[in-house]
């Protein structure tokens, strides 16, 4: 018997900036009956780009969840940003989606962000579809994009299910569905019948040849030169897609609506249901505990979900977007955050439509919905990736989300007294929504230091402070977000003693341990002393506060710690009158001396830089990169006579790279940069 989740498809739309993700989302909403008229990115009228900054800039900044029906199925899609500075939105979308649609521009081909996002999708084992859009544009090159896909997808082979038919000048005459033999596309001219027959024969030959290599069931048909019936073909395509052996490729134009209905049919036919995703190798590794044993005393599954993001909006109000992996959630249910040891009661359940929502009584396993708190209490401090459990469920923590560390910082100062007063709270609220925003109090009163993933990211932070929180700011020059780690393991104790009077001496002893961790581990802080201590709660909190401040940059280097485990092992005092300030001081002494003993190492962020330019300019670009301490990884040709260079380069060397590249290339080159690694900053003593 079919389960309700068999008729659910959750997928993210991923691509490079300006490839057409948001336009495709608009067209999907139109085709599924959710929109009478499609909005336009250039007019700022799209459903999924609802932030003021998105509509002004014409780009997606936050991921937007939209639920719509198609042929008896419930589709939930996430339109994700295409700019590298908003990687967190893409990362958490990939974590909770069951599949992905990669959108490629038929003119520009496989661009840098497309490649980066697909690598991350492949890391989650996501099956997917590809849609080559903008075939209505001059210079569209479907075959060239297909060849690039073959290099990008690695062992997963592109499987074209449709092909464009063009005249000798490259003008699009029609798009051929290889499964049905039907034509769609421009209505003003029909391609010659012999061209259609040749394209159909050749396209089906390649389709069958590709499938026969990974699906034995079609090998006999291929060897006999026979095209299988539609049912057998769909089954073979579906099985190969779910095993990540192929990625079906559709094509058309989102703006004109060509190929979108065919794409939606492919979504329900070939992409996995939530249950199939859970049964995949990735699902079994990630959710080993969600089996028959995870049932309530009533015999039904406990509700288990992952927090995707906190959304603050005028309508429908603040809510938490979640993905359910088990059970049912409904209004009035008490939920427990397994990561933060806090509970809260669900007030409303929302079906999401970007900035809009529809209230529903409940949601079940496989769905992506919004949960609001009751009117009596606000949403608690739940972070993206936290595991939420129905009250009474056994303790379970699902795999957490990982986000890149900030690479750039700005010192912000409120313009007037009210701005300076409200700035910290506004930054704290933004950081709750976006886990890649970090902030701390600045070097002077009224100042804060905000850190993010790039210049655009921090520009948007300032714009949102002004438009959403009415906080106007002045900003200093961008600064690279360095980090500190340690070279070796160190364990020591320090004692702080002070005589307050001839008869009263206060004393505290703190023992700590520093240990280097592998790359991308972040800072891990542990307080095992609390398991056996008899110290008052206030003293324990003072010790934890001192340690947290030290990790966040309150140390001799001035930079936050990373790739380091700090363990506060023992804390003791012989004087019952010892207060919090004494423990605070003793902890800081132990931490500072331990950092020095372990060998502090300042790390600089290194970026993976990709530059695309006309071929004749790539030499000058490479010379400039060499002067910026770049390590060139590859240089290759692009369709249309362009060249691409990929290099690793320290962030400090490319803070103002956009201006320099514009000068070198006369404005004809483009670049993207994504965090790649942390490396030891030059000039430090060994």
Which residues make up each language-model segment?
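Structural and coupling elements of P-loop NTPases
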Residues: 1-686
């Amino acid at each position: 018997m079919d389960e309700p989740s068999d008729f659910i498809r959750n997928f993210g739309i991923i691509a490079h900036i300006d490839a057409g993700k948001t336009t495709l989302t608009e067209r999907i909403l139109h085709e599924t009956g959710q929109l009478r008229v499609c909005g336009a990115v250039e007019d700022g009228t799209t459903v999924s780009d609802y932030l003021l900054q998105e509509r002004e800039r014409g780009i997606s900044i936050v991921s937007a969840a939209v639920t719509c029906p198609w042929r008896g199925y419930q589709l939930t899609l996430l339109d994700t940003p295409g700019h590298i500075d908003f990687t967190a939105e893409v990362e958490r979308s990939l974590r909770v989606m069951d599949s992905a649609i990669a959108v490629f521009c038929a003119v520009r081909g496989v661009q840098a962000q497309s490649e980066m996002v697909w690598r991350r999708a492949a890391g989650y084992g996501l099956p997917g579809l590809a849609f080559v859009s903008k075939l209505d544009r001059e210079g569209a090159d479907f075959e060239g994009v297909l060849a690039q896909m073959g290099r990008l997808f690695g062992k997963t082979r592109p499987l074209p299910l449709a092909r464009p038919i063009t005249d000798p000048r490259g003008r699009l005459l029609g798009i051929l569905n290889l499964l049905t033999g039907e034509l769609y596309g421009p209505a003003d001219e029909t391609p010659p019948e012999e061209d259609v027959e040749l394209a159909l024969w050749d396209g089906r030959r390649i389709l069958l040849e590709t499938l026969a290599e990974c699906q034995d069931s079609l090998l006999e048909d291929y060897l006999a030169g026979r095209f299988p019936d539609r049912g057998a073909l769909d089954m073979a395509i579906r099985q190969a897609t779910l095993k990540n052996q192929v990625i079906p490729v559709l094509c058309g134009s989102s703006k004109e609506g060509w190929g979108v209905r065919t794409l939606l049919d492919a979504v329900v036919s070939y992409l996995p249901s939530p249950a199939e995703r859970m049964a995949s190798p990735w699902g079994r590794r990630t959710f080993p505990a969600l089996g028959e044993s995870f049932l309530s005393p009533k015999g039904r599954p406990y509700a288990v979900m992952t927090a995707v993001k906190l959304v603050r909006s005028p309508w429908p109000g603040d809510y938490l977007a979640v993905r359910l992996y088990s059970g049912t959630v409904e209004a009035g249910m008490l939920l427990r955050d397994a990561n933060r040891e806090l509970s809260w009661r669900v007030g409303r359940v929302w079906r999401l439509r970007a900035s809009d929502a529809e209230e529903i009584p409940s949601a079940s396993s496989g769905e992506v919905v919004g949960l609001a708190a009751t009117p009596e209490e606000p949403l608690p401090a739940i972070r993206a990736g936290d595991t939420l459990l129905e009250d009474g469920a056994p303790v379970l923590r699902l795999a957490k989300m990982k986000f890149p560390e900030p690479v750039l910082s700005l010192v912000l100062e409120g313009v007037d007294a009210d701005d300076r007063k409200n700035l910290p709270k506004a930054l704290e609220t933004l950081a709750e929504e976006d886990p890649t925003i970090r902030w701390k109090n600045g070097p002077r009163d009224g100042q804060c230091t905000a850190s993010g993933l790039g210049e655009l990211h921090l520009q948007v932070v300032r714009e949102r402070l002004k438009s959403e929180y009415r906080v106007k700011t002045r900003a200093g020059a961008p600064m690279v977000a360095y980090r500190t780690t340690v070279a070796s393991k160190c364990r020591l104790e320090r004692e702080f003693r002070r005589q307050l009077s001839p008869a009263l001496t206060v004393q505290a002893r703190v023992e700590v341990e520093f240990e280097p961790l592998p790359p991308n581990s972040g800072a891990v802080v542990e307080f095992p002393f609390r398991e056996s201590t008899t110290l008052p709660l206030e003293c324990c909190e003072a010790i934890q506060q001192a340690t947290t401040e030290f990790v966040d940059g309150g140390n001799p280097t001035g930079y936050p710690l990373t790739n380091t485990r700090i363990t506060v092992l023992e804390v003791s005092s012989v004087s019952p009158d010892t207060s919090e300030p004494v423990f605070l001081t003793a902890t800081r002494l132990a931490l500072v001396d331990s950092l020095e003993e372990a060998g502090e190492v300042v790390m600089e962020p290194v970026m993976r830089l990709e530059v695309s330019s006309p071929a004749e300019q790539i030499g000058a670009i490479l010379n400039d990169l060499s002067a910026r301490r770049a390590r060139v990884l590859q240089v290759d040709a692009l369709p249309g006579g362009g060249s691409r260079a990929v290099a690793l380069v320290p962030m400090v060397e490319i803070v103002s790279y956009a201006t320099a590249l514009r000068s070198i290339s006369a404005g004809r080159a483009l670049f993207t940069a994504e965090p790649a690694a942390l490396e030891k900053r030059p000039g430090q003593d060994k």
